[in-house]
From Swiss-Prot:
This is Uracil-DNA glycosylase. Pfam families: UDG. PROSITE patterns: U_DNA_GLYCOSYLASE. The lineage of its organism: Viruses, Duplodnaviria, Heunggongvirae, Peploviricota, Herviviricetes. InterPro entries: UDG_fam1, Ura-DNA_Glyclase_AS, Uracil-DNA_glycosylase-like, Uracil-DNA_glycosylase-like_sf.
């Protein structure tokens, strides 16, 4: 039956036998005959040229589903990027070549477009790479992987899980502190959620997505920050040994797979209150220090000061 409600009739050219359905007024093909189809010619007609390719942004929000952009073709000035985003010069050797890659150019192009359109992006431009400013690649000792920045204004400042002083620690950070106090019961309880004291000791607090639209978690996953972060982690793994990786949740564990013969790789459920496994029992902070002690290296002071 067609969309008008009339019975669908098939000619004898396409069937050898017609049967009427018992339950509906529809003619059913009992022995359909296959039609011969003409193959479409391959390639473009002579003289036809296509415009330069554009890429559709499959954003999680419908607001950007119709937006397109063309990849940057001009050479990206790494010095300019380092200056604009306040990236520490200590990271130049590790990041400069990667920032010239076409995908990285696309990230910054789209980031600028969003800013110019009036979108409120967190954290501020100067804090997106704040994780580079507390220690250089050769000083990294512990790597903790997060997902994307807190989407609430005033919270995110470029360090995974950390919030600015004066901000009430979010639930995930409270669970991290609970595990910390379980491991070190004599430690002074944290009075704020700023983890800069960890970062200064070589704890890399790195989100896999470096920006977010205010109020919309996961909104900037499509930009491609994850690829840049994976390259950073890959180079750290290749150039260093003896690092401690704390991979909390499936997302972090899929982001990087360090060689356990060269590094200490610790896994646990995410500290989110929605996790089925309580984070309070996570002993990663103690295990990291035990690892450093065996190597004759100083421990990390996990106090939040």
């Amino acid at each position: 039956m067609d969309v008008s409600g009339e019975p669908t009739v098939c000619s004898n050219a396409y069937a050898n036998e017609m049967k009427l359905s018992d339950s509906k007024d529809i003619y059913v093909l009992a022995h359909p005959v296959t039609k011969k189809t003409r193959k479409r010619p391959r390639g473009l007609p002579l003289g036809v040229k296509l415009d330069p390719p554009t890429f559709k942004l499959n954003n999680m929000s419908h607001h950007y589903d119709t937006e397109t952009f063309t990849p940057v073709s001009s050479q990206l000035d790494s010095v300019e990027v380092f200056s604009k985003f306040n990236i520490s010069p200590e990271w130049y050797d590790l990041l400069s070549d990667e920032l010239k890659e076409p995908y990285a150019k696309g990230i910054f192009l789209e980031y600028n477009r969003l800013l110019n359109s009036g979108e409120e992006i967190l954290p501020s431009t100067g804090d997106i790479f704040a994780w580079t400013r507390f220690c250089g690649p050769q000083s990294i000792r512990v790597v903790i992987i997060g997902q994307d920045p807190y989407p609430t204004a005033g919270h995110a400042h470029g360090l995974a899980f950390s919030v600015k002083r004066g901000i009430t620690p979010p639930s995930s950070l409270k669970n991290i502190f609970a595990a910390l106090m379980e491991s070190y019961p004599n430690m002074t309880p944290p009075t704020h959620g700023c983890l800069e004291s960890w970062a200064r000791q070589g704890v890399l607090l790195l989100n896999t997505t470096l920006t977010v639209r205010r109020g919309t978690p996961g909104s900037h996953v499509y930009l491609g920050w994850g690829r840049l972060v994976q390259r950073v982690l890959q180079r750290l793994c290749e150039n260093r040994t003896g690092l401690v990786f704390m991979l909390w949740g499936a997302h972090a564990q899929k982001t990087t797979q360090p060689n356990s013969r060269c590094h200490l790789v610790l896994t646990h459920a995410h500290p989110s209150p929605l996790s089925r496994v309580p984070f309070r029992n996570c002993r990663h902070f103690v295990q990291a220090n035990e690892y450093f002690t065996r190597k004759g290296e100083p421990e990390i002071d996990w106090s939040v000061i």
